[in-house]
Amino acid sequence: MGAKRERIQPDKLHVRKDGDKVLYSQVMVVEVGGTRQIFVAGQTPRDAHGSCVGMGDMRAQIEQVGRNIKDALEAAGATLADIVKTTTYVTDMDEYFKHQDMRMRFFSDALPTSTTVQVARLSRPEFMVEIEAFAIV
């Protein structure tokens, strides 16, 4: 018997479409062996309408991305405390590290494992940070 999968498109999150067709799932919940594994697609600093929050402001972008991850997890019945792994993509590592305290506001003492990678560009040129999250409940 295969794992049960549930795709979630939270109302609070913007999702890219081609016409009326959604191009990806914001959240995928996979139930395996009595646990719910929650995969949150890379969150960018978009608001629910698709506008970039914090143009040119890494700190504001990190805050918006954190809110988006929180909203995605809540839609799946989880919290930020359930995150076990994040992958962060940034366009300027030095600038990102100046604002680590903003990222830390979203986590309790049980910090998730984390990978941070600098990239040349994200999906839109004004985006400075994108974070994927993996949670287990």
Q: Which sequence ranges carry the predicted segments?
A:
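N-terminal presequence-like segments and the immediate start of the first folded domain
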Residues: M1-R67, D71-V84, V90-V137
